[in-house]
Amino acid sequence: MAAKIISGTELSKQIKANLADKITHYIEQGKRAPGLAVILVGADPASQIYVGNKRKSCEEVGILSKSYDLPETTTQNELLAIIDQLNADKNIDGILVQLPLPKQINAEAIIERIDPKKDVDGFHPYNVGRLCQRIPTLRACTPYGVMKLLETTGIDLHGKHAVIVGASNIVGRPMSLELLLAGATVTVTHRFTKNLENHVRQADILVVAVGKPNLISGDWIKESAVVIDVGINRVDGKLVGDVEFDKAAEKAAYITPVPGGVGPMTVAMLMSNTLYAYEHNK
């Protein structure tokens, strides 16, 4: 059985078209456009690509993006001062600081300084805490995007065994909270987990977010599972995920491709969060 492909490219286009319609409606009513501040420190090539994609998406949907391209030598206090300015700026609804940051800057301190109502990445402890308490507002973009992809399958997640490979603050941990909220039974695996294969074989829903090419053998996939591959790795000039795609697709019912799966959804949910922050910016 060949798995159905869950296209993040297609779904993200639909989401962004819907957001663009809403923003056009606000502007026609004489309101200002939503504003997103995008901060990049240093010249990491991957970060530059990600930031470029985010700015391009802002243009597509009608969000005004304000760019801050700062040198690698920027100090923590300099960055905190910019965040304080943006927190006070009534025309800025969302603040995004592209990670990773240079070693002289403490990422946690930066994230905590952002006004939780403008934390469109969904990383602030306040917003993660709200998700944990089952009252989410601004949600981490990648896990939120994964939930939207899972919705397209029509599968009821209640009682399904969801296995997450990777326990990062950006994907794995908030992903576990999203799946719990949806009624799944959740197992989170990480670098100290013994017998990873055994856990993966039990997964009705498998979400992999580690950043190691072909970490998950296609043979491990349970028949008719849903496989969400968050990993993005470059191998021999090609982008590949964390899951051995071809073999996994023979056993799974649904699978996301890399590229064109989770990546576009992360950016779409950032746009969605920015509109949400705009609508609630009082």
Curated annotation (Swiss-Prot):
NADP(+) binds at residues 166-168, 232. The keyword Chloroplast does not apply. Belongs to the tetrahydrofolate dehydrogenase/cyclohydrolase family. The lineage of its organism: Bacteria, Pseudomonadati, Pseudomonadota, Gammaproteobacteria, Pasteurellales. It catalyses: (6R)-5,10-methylene-5,6,7,8-tetrahydrofolate + NADP(+) = (6R)-5,10-methenyltetrahydrofolate + NADPH; (6R)-5,10-methenyltetrahydrofolate + H2O = (6R)-10-formyltetrahydrofolate + H(+). Its EC number is 1.5.1.5, 3.5.4.9. GO terms for molecular function: methenyltetrahydrofolate cyclohydrolase activity; methylenetetrahydrofolate dehydrogenase (NADP+) activity. Keywords: Amino-acid biosynthesis, Histidine biosynthesis, Hydrolase, Methionine biosynthesis, Multifunctional enzyme, NADP, One-carbon metabolism, Oxidoreductase, Purine biosynthesis. InterPro entries: Aminoacid_DH-like_N_sf, NAD(P)-bd_dom_sf, THF_DH/CycHdrlase, THF_DH/CycHdrlase_cat_dom, THF_DH/CycHdrlase_CS, THF_DH/CycHdrlase_NAD-bd_dom. It comes from Haemophilus influenzae (strain ATCC 51907 / DSM 11121 / KW20 / Rd). This is Bifunctional protein FolD. SUPFAM superfamilies: Aminoacid dehydrogenase-like, N-terminal domain (SSF53223), NAD(P)-binding Rossmann-fold domains (SSF51735). GO terms for cellular component: cytosol. CDD domains: NAD_bind_m-THF_DH_Cyclohyd. Homodimer. Catalyzes the oxidation of 5,10-methylenetetrahydrofolate to 5,10-methenyltetrahydrofolate and then the hydrolysis of 5,10-methenyltetrahydrofolate to 10-formyltetrahydrofolate. Pathway: One-carbon metabolism; tetrahydrofolate interconversion. One of its GO terms (biological process) is L-histidine biosynthetic process. It comes from the Bacteria. NCBIfam families: PRK10792.1, PRK14186.1.
